[in-house]
């Protein structure tokens, strides 16, 4: 079953104790429930959840990665534009006219464009899944069967594809931008390292390696992608 638990009650204690080096507000802190009150209507069977739920959650992370990519590209563009210091063995008198440095900025811009395109395509798949779910809905509450549909499957695969690609492209791009600035780009006052830290943190919340396996299994064996999964510490099985 799945339970919706209100956190504005004495039985719920939320702790902002996550100390990751990057993106904040990712909901990674500790939550402890002690005799928390749950209303009957807030308890549903797992099969009654909407089938594209995990894809929807992943889309939030993909959109965040796309935003990081665009922010990094925009910031490096402005930084190179205003850079006066250059190298004697560079390809131009000023950094802003150096074709090699311009190529670095161009790659960052291309990654940001690709990330936005991935998010848009995944959004279309999610829209189709939501439309299909609404078409199946009979107006009831707990009795509705949100069993997996072809649209749910496509939404799951679309976000998985995006995750596999962006989890590598965006952190790599956030590292490459420093090649356009030299050592001055590492000045703590600029804070350019935050783009990599944020991208790396977001990408780590749901490891892409598992989604790559799911995509391969679907492509080769026609396997259905898992829609319900969890993370936590495995409980050792008792032996006789």
Where are these regions (language model features)?
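Glycine-rich phosphate/cofactor-binding loops in nucleotide/flavin-utilizing enzymes
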Residues: 179-240
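Hydrophobic packing residues in well-ordered alpha-helices of helical domains and bundles
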Residues: 62, 105-108, 152-155, 159, ...
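Charged, amphipathic alpha-helical oligomerization/scaffolding segments
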Residues: 68, 75, 107, 111-114, ...
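C-terminal helix-coil-helix/basic helical segment that borders enzyme active sites and/or dimer interfaces
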Residues: 114-165, 178-183
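A short core secondary-structure module
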Residues: 1-13
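Glycine-rich beta->alpha junctions and the first turn(s) of the following alpha-helix
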Residues: 20-116
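Charged/polar positions within long, soluble alpha-helices
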Residues: 74, 78-81, 117-120, 124, ...
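Short beta-alpha junctions and helix-cap segments that line functional grooves
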Residues: 15-19
């Amino acid at each position: 079953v799945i339970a919706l638990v209100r956190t504005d009650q004495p039985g719920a204690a939320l702790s902002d104790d996550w100390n990751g080096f990057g993106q904040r507000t990712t909901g990674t802190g500790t939550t402890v429930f002690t005799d928390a009150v749950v209303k009957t209507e807030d308890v549903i069977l797992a099969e009654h959840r909407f089938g594209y739920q995990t894809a929807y959650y992943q889309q939030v992370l993909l959109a965040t990665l796309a935003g990081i990519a665009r922010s990094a590209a925009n910031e490096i563009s402005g930084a190179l534009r205003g850079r006066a210091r250059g190298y004697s063995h560079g390809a131009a008198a000023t950094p802003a006219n150096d074709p090699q440095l311009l190529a670095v900025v161009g790659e960052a811009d291309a990654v940001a464009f690709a990330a936005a395109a991935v998010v848009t395509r995944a959004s279309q798949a999610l829209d189709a899944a939501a439309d299909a779910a609404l078409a199946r809905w009979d107006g009831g509450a707990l009795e509705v069967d949100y069993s997996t549909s072809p649209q749910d499957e496509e939404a799951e695969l679309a976000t998985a594809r995006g995750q596999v690609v962006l989890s590598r492209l965006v952190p790599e791009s956030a590292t490459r931008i420093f090649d356009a600035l030299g050592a001055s780009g590492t000045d703590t006052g600029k804070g350019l390292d935050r783009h990599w830290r944020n991208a790396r943190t977001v990408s780590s919340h749901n490891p892409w390696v598992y989604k790559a396996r799911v995509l391969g299994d679907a492509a080769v064996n026609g396997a259905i992608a898992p829609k319900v999964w969890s993370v936590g510490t495995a409980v050792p099985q008792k032996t006789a």
